[in-house]
Amino acid sequence: MNIKKFRILFFFNKKYSYLSTIKLKEFHLNHWEKYNNKLKIMENIPNGKKRQNTYLDGGSDFDVNKKTRLVLLNERGVSGRIPTTANIGEINNKDNVLKTFDVCNSFNSAFENDKSEELETHHDKIVGLKIPTIHDTIKTEKKVIIKKECEIKDVNPNDKIGGSLENDKIEGGLENEKIGGGLENDKKNELPEQVRKNVNVIVTWNMNSITVRYKNKEKWKRFMKFVNEINADVLCFQEVRLPALNISKNESKNVNNKVYGGKKNEGEERNRGSVKNTDQKSLIDYKIVEEILKNDFKEYNGYFSLANIKYSGQLVLVKKSIKVKSVRYNLLFETDPNIHNDEGRIILLEFSNFYLLSTYSPNNGFDQTKFKRRSLFDNQMKEFVLFMKNENKNLIWTGDLNIAPEDVDLSHPIEFRKMKKGNVPKEYIGQPGCTDAERANFKTILKNGDLIDSYRYFENYKIKNDPTYKRKTNINDNIYTWRCPFLIGKSCNRAMRIDHFIVSKNLLNQIENIEIHGYSVFHTNFYGSDHCPVILNMKK
């Protein structure tokens, strides 16, 4: 009886094994036919960097280079495999934009298991999700093409090297788009003269990194509420800390913004009017800035001037309803206006009735190198404002000027004025921003340009003409624009007024008031930065 059972079991297992083998062969044959059909699209493809996929209904384009291989496309013209670690922003498929970030893993899983129904379902979920890009007007007729990430074995020295981003290019995506562009973007959004308006409200703010500020959603939301409440026409942001776009020498010939090397990466050419997006790390910041400009400041045109690295740099935003007549990124009128300061410290815009200069003036520091750098900048400012005065050009100079003109602009004047490191000349003793040398240069700048410190002017005017008005002296009052970021320690509660609106005397009668937005040792209305916004209101 046991032997019979054993024979039956043996026969059953053998038959089951035979059936499994047949099924397995059918499975492989079926998949080989599918794979072989897909390979037919490559039979007559010529060698070269551009090839044409003639699969089914007209096909779609894809590129091939030494660092990538061909990726098969399904009936929809979409590669089944989406790299989960690749830098994929938007993928344009005619009028549809596919959002891939949240569905990459499930999409890949469906493809690997050859579950066509599941793949179809995922695709239907993806299509229809719309992601705004930095240029709404840009449309592409290409289908979705993705180059799969792969290891690089042989690299041509002439090829661009940019990590996985260079290996995962998306046709019609962010690779060909740049944040910035200045007047080129302004012209695209140009309004008829009769609907254009004048500048009424200007805000200056040292952000101490635009991406860091944005990541704190609660504080950023409060900042945007403030911007919308005052209905700012122009926003001048300093220290945005975004690297400039690096470009090849051939590309630099076609770039409007002149480029040249900085302290780091000497000789590497940059487009200082655009944000870097050529590697994974920079692409993260690029996407944040794109989102800010597209969602929060969609009614504004942006003008960038950036350094080589995440240091310094500026962004000026102007409402599209206001005409910008010209833009300059240096202080020398005899030179090309598109030559930038190599640390992005200067943006000069011309409006109908005045020029607006936004600067992130160099910190004086505590050593001879920094002293010379600040002195050189101040000397350029002396010549610039003198030229503006002689040409009868009204000027509003704003930004983080890194100067406290008087002791009243210091929370602890005695301590600030004694600070030093090592043996330095007497005129450089003191906290950077309040040394005798800096103050002397600042006074000369005001004199040469016939300029006025507008905040101090209006404060003194109130004290002189309004008996009920008393000068604010409390550490918690809104009289300082910079406050020490530390709430404990030797420097806690220290504060200075170093962000300004310096204006031509001819413009004083057009200004309503100057307001320092932040206050308190707890940094109220500083929105995460060590500086607070300052507001200039023009008379309407």
Curated annotation (Swiss-Prot):
Q: Where is the signal peptide?
A: none
Protein origin, superkingdom = Eukaryota
Q: Which residues bind Mg(2+)?
A: N206, E239, D400, N402, D530, H531
Q: Does the keyword Zinc apply?
A: no
What cellular component GO annotations does this protein have? mitochondrion; nucleus
What Gene Ontology terms describe what this protein does at the molecular function level? Answer: DNA-(apurinic or apyrimidinic site) endonuclease activity; double-stranded DNA 3'-5' DNA exonuclease activity; endonuclease activity; metal ion binding; phosphoric diester hydrolase activity
What Enzyme Commission number(s) apply to this enzyme?
A: 3.1.11.2
Biological process GO annotation list?
Answer: base-excision repair
What cofactor does this chain's UniProt record say it requires? Mg(2+); Mn(2+)
**UniProt keyword Ligase present:** no
Question: Which PROSITE patterns does this one have?
Answer: AP_NUCLEASE_F1_4 (PS51435)
Q: How is the cofactor bound?
A: Probably binds two magnesium or manganese ions per subunit.
Q: Which InterPro entries match?
A: AP_endonuc_1, Endo/exonu/phosph_ase_sf, Endo/exonuclease/phosphatase
Spell out the reaction equation it catalyses: Exonucleolytic cleavage in the 3'- to 5'-direction to yield nucleoside 5'-phosphates
UniProt's post-translational modification comment states: May be proteolytically cleaved.
Q: Where is this region: Disordered?
A: 256-276
The protein's location, in the record's own words, is: Mitochondrion
Phenotype of null mutants: Normal growth of blood-stage parasites. Developmental stages in the mosquito vector are normal with no difference in oocyst numbers and salivary gland sporozoites. C57BL/6 mice infected with knockout sporozoites have a 2-day delay in the appearance of blood-stage infection and have reduced parasitemia. Formation and release of merosomes from infected mouse hepatocytes are normal. However, merosome infectivity towards host erythrocytes is partially impaired resulting in a delay in the appearance of blood stage infection.
Record keywords, A-Z:
DNA damage, DNA repair, Endonuclease, Exonuclease, Hydrolase, Magnesium, Manganese, Metal-binding, Mitochondrion, Nuclease, Transit peptide
> What spans are recorded as compositionally biased (Basic and acidic residues)?
263-276
Q: Where is the active site?
A: H531 (proton acceptor)
Its function? Multifunctional protein that plays a central role in mitochondrial DNA base excision repair pathway induced by oxidative stress. Has apurinic/apyrimidinic (AP) endonuclease activity towards double-stranded DNA (dsDNA). Has nucleotide incision repair (NIR) activity; acts on dsDNA with oxidized bases thymine glycol and 5,6-dihydro-2'-deoxyuridine. Has 3'-5' exonuclease; can use dsDNA templates with 3'-OH termini including blunt-end, gapped and mismatched 3'-recessed.
Q: Give the family per the record.
A: Belongs to the DNA repair enzymes AP/ExoA family.
Which PANTHER family does this UniProt record tie to the protein? AP ENDONUCLEASE (PTHR22748), DNA-(APURINIC OR APYRIMIDINIC SITE) ENDONUCLEASE (PTHR22748:SF6)
What is this protein's record name?
Answer: DNA-(apurinic or apyrimidinic site) endonuclease
- Gene behind this chain? APE1
